[in-house]
């Protein structure tokens, strides 16, 4: 091997070794393997979620958010995430941040029924809809929610007492999986957030996260259980 590969910040660097013969070469041949993501199944993701138990032993960190963007739209995967979240190693609690499928739910009025019918109703779930975009890139909203929660926690000395709701998010729009724009008025966003207990985004003079309820709401009205910020403390 004449080179080594490593990441630095957001860049992938290829560095020739000191004794490499490639310094004098006119052409370089670089070989690599590419993961075939098409072979991943929902069952693979479910098995991966089970290994969250090993995080403390392997890296010395216990996750407090479990996220599987692109897969938590499968109700079975979401259920496994929620089942694992409340008791990691029998000691630690987390929240499963899950997405509602925008291929099926393409309008805000369908959110509550789909959520209820498909079991996204756990106090260990932060349920999210729709997708979001930044420029030409589409993201599952759970990615944005996890990032914002982590930032808010970090700003508060890693104490999770503050809600992520009504905090700015760096996106340029809300969309469904097919790219269709989702434009919500404040009352419509409240139908998703307050009536359905689902976290969404709202453009009200700037994009913000909108919603502070866990999946168990509105069935549960216990303040200690239904709010993201009180339940996580």
Show where each model-derived region lies.
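A glycine- and small-residue-enriched flexible loop/hinge signal that marks low-structured segments
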Residues: 43-233
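Surface-exposed interaction regions enriched in Ser/Thr/Asp/Glu
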Residues: 1-43
């Amino acid at each position: 091997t004449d080179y080594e590969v490593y990441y630095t910040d957001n860049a992938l660097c290829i560095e020739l070794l000191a004794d490499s013969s490639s310094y004098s070469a006119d052409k370089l041949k670089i070989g690599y393997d590419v993961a075939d993501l098409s072979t991943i199944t929902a069952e693979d993701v479910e098995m991966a979620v089970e290994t969250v138990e090993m995080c403390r032993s392997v890296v010395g960190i216990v996750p407090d958010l479990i996220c599987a963007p692109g897969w938590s739209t499968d109700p079975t995967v979401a259920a496994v995430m929620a089942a694992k979240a409340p008791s990691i190693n029998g000691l630690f609690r987390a929240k499963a941040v899950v997405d509602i499928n925008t291929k099926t739910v393409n309008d805000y009025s369908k959110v509550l029924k789909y959520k209820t019918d498909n079991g996204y109703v756990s106090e260990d779930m932060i349920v999210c809809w729709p997708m979001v975009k930044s420029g030409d890139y589409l993201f599952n909203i759970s990615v944005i929610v996890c990032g914002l929660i982590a930032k808010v926690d970090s700003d508060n000395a890693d104490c999770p007492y503050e809600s992520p709701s009504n905090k700015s998010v760096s996106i340029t729009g809300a969309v469904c999986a097919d790219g269709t724009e989702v434009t919500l008025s404040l009352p419509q966003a409240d139908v998703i957030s307050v009536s359905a207990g689902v976290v969404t985004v709202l453009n009200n003079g700037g994009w913000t996260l909108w919603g502070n309820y866990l999946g168990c709401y509105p069935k549960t009205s216990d303040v200690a259980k239904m709010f993201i910020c009180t339940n996580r403390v």
